[in-house]
């Protein structure tokens, strides 16, 4: 990984432990040049700082870089922006803007100043910054493994000077991911009060800067780990460092470190590694995050968030290494300053505690409606929509119940010192309990992974259920269509069978009628003759009957009847004659009747044979019907096979 050191690292180191103090009533003056606000360098005054290490370390710079380091590295989280914003000048205009700088005290506007702290007022020369930034590059790294995390982190072990080409274009901000959930933040940053460092209660004064009253700033320091989650803030910071490494006037747009602060942090690296190796490894574990998953800008609380599931596999890019190395160095420098009680930034306990409480009370509101964004001029304030969180000066004024633009004495804020300190100590995570927080964070990460796997399995189950339901519905539709087709085929076959049966019955009736007609056609002549014979026979029978009646009924059988024998003889003889005549006619008719009888016997025999033949025909018809049904079924089966 490669880390770019600003111009303050190239300036010779001098001993500035006890310089004369600044006058707090002096106000920084600004001048507009080349479309941007330039701060006027003040007179050569050195500022004593209780945060500077008393040990012999390279931590001082010249007068021109003192104000720059105060404005950038003292806060590392508050980005000062003027009320009127201008785009940063191009690299091609750097020489012109540097040569045209005119610092006139009378032409600069006055700015409001905070009570307890002094604003930075000087900006170093552009050409000096560019030369220093191109001379100092850390090029070699070594990958280690954290025991409780298992992730690799970068640890600078050597230095090598190389030339770096300033980037004139800026990349687009990559897609931001969601911040760490509140549950993971509570697990990863559980406070342990008995392990707090002595300087932990004074962190607010070393991490806050009162900006211009007309501007707004964003606190991206240690409280950002609670406000937005380490992953979100780190991603925003790293995206900004990748998009704007060097601006047109030679200054680093990130605004985290600069001047003597960067030199001090770079030189205090090795001492901090030996003093707090665990903390150094804890802070470094987040600096191997990818360009979309990095920690916040060098904060110790941001290092506590490295177990929250936001650190992913790293891609060692030069710009990523540049930002992470600066975060690590700045964190070591600020941790060392917290133990030093000689800095003027901690001179006012009331302002320090009020700044801490104001930042801490703003964290919950800031976590829900202020995602951090990056702009061409650096980190801008949160959401530029309906609601924008106030700058630290306004938060300080809210916490102390005093106006933001007026100067209040320290006595006004001493009333709530104990309550604010207790609240801060209850919610401030300990640095020494980092491994436990990492374990809890890994537990939360495992839960998140389990929930993610459960969601994936549930989605897969839903997909399979949907596929099975769709297949079942398709099969059901096919089954219904097949059943409908079979039903229609059965109906058509039944209708066809009924029609065939009716046609067969009609055919049988026609055949019987034809047979009867053929038989009766031969007997019609005999029947016509029989009618004539029957008429004559009936006439003769009627005459014989009348003669017998007349002869028998009129005979006096009793009652002493007297008959003439001659007359009786004649009557009987006449009757016999009639009988003989009738016998002759009867004989002639008998022959005809016998012939008719023989014909009728033959007819009976023929009808018997016909009945037998009809029974055989009926059996044949039943067999033909069964065979026809089989034939129809075979035909329908052949038709279905041909369609498929």
From Swiss-Prot:
Induction pattern: Up-regulated by norflurazon.
InterPro entries cross-referenced by the UniProt entry: QWRF (IPR007573)
GO cellular component, as recorded: microtubule; peroxisome
Tissue specificity comment: Expressed in young developing tissues, such as seedlings, roots, flowers, buds and young siliques, and to a lesser extent in mature green tissues.
QWRF motif (motif): residue ranges: 463-466
Keywords assigned: Peroxisome
Ranges annotated as biased composition (Basic and acidic residues): 172-190
Protein name, UniProt field: Protein SNOWY COTYLEDON 3
Organism whose genome encodes this protein: Arabidopsis thaliana
């Amino acid at each position: 990984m490669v880390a770019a050191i600003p111009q303050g690292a190239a300036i010779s180191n001098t001993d500035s432990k006890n310089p004369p103090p600044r006058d707090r009533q002096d106000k920084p003056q600004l001048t507009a040049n080349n479309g941007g606000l330039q701060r006027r360098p003040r007179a050569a005054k050195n500022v004593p700082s209780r945060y500077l290490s008393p040990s012999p370390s390279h931590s001082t710079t010249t007068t021109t870089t003192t104000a720059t380091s105060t404005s950038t590295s003292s806060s590392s989280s508050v980005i000062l922006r003027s009320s009127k914003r201008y785009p940063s000048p191009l690299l091609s205009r750097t020489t012109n803007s540097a040569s045209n700088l005119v610092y006139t005290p009378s032409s600069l506007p006055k700015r409001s100043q905070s009570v307890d702290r002094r604003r930075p007022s000087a900006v170093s020369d552009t050409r000096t910054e560019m030369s220093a930034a191109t001379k100092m590059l850390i090029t070699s790294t070594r990958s280690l493994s954290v025991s409780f995390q298992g992730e690799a982190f970068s640890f600078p072990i050597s230095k090598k000077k190389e030339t770096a080409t300033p980037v004139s274009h800026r990349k687009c901000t990559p897609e931001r991911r969601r911040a760490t959930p509140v549950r993971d933040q509570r697990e990863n940053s559980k406070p342990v009060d008995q392990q707090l460092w002595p300087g932990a209660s004074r962190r607010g004064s070393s991490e806050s800067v009162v900006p211009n009253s007309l501007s707004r700033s964003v606190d991206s320091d240690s409280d950002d780990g609670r406000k937005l989650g380490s992953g979100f803030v780190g991603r925003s910071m790293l995206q900004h460092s990748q998009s704007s490494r060097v601006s047109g006037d030679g200054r680093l747009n990130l605004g985290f470190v600069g001047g003597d602060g960067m030199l001090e942090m770079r030189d205090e690296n090795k001492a901090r590694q030996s003093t707090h190796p665990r903390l150094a490894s804890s802070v470094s574990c987040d600096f191997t995050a990818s360009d979309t998953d990095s920690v916040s800008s060098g904060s110790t609380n941001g290092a506590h968030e490295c177990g929250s599931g936001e650190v992913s596999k790293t891609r060692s890019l030069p710009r990523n290494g540049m930002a992470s190395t600066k975060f690590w160095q700045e964190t070591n420098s600020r941790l060392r300053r917290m133990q030093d009680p000689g800095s003027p930034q901690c001179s006012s306990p009331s302002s320090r505690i009020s700044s801490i409480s104001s930042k801490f009370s703003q964290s919950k509101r800031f976590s829900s409606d202020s995602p951090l964004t990056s702009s061409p001029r650096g980190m801008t304030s949160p959401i530029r929509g309906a609601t924008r969180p106030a700058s630290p000066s306004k938060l300080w004024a809210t916490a102390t119940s005093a106006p933001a633009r007026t100067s209040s004495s320290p006595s006004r804020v001493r009333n709530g010192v104990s309550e604010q300190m207790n609240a801060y100590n209850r919610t401030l995570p300990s640095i020494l309990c980092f491994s436990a927080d990492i374990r809890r964070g890994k537990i939360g990460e495992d839960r998140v992974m389990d929930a993610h796997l459960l969601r994936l399995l549930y989605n897969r189950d839903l997909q399979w259920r949907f596929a099975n339901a769709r297949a079942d519905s398709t099969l059901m539709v096919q089954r219904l269509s097949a059943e409908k087709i079979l039903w229609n085929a059965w109906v058509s076959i039944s209708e066809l069978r009924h029609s065939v049966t009716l046609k067969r019955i009609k055919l049988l009736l026609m055949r019987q009628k034809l047979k009867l007609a053929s038989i009766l056609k031969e007997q019609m002549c005999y029947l016509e003759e029989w009618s004539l014979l029957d008429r004559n026979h009936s006439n003769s029978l009627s005459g014989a009957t009348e003669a017998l009646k007349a002869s028998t009924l009129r005979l006096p059988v009793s009652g002493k009847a007297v008959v003439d024998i001659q007359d009786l003889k004649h009557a009987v003889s006449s009757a016999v004659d009639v009988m003989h005549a009738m016998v002759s006619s009867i004989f002639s008719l008998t022959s005809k009747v016998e012939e008719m009888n023989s014909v009728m016997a033959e007819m009976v025999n023929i009808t018997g044979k016909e009945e037998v033949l009809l029974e055989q025909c009926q059996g044949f018809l039943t067999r033909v019907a069964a065979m026809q049904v089989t034939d129809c079924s075979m035909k329908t089966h052949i038709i279905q096979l041909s369609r498929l």
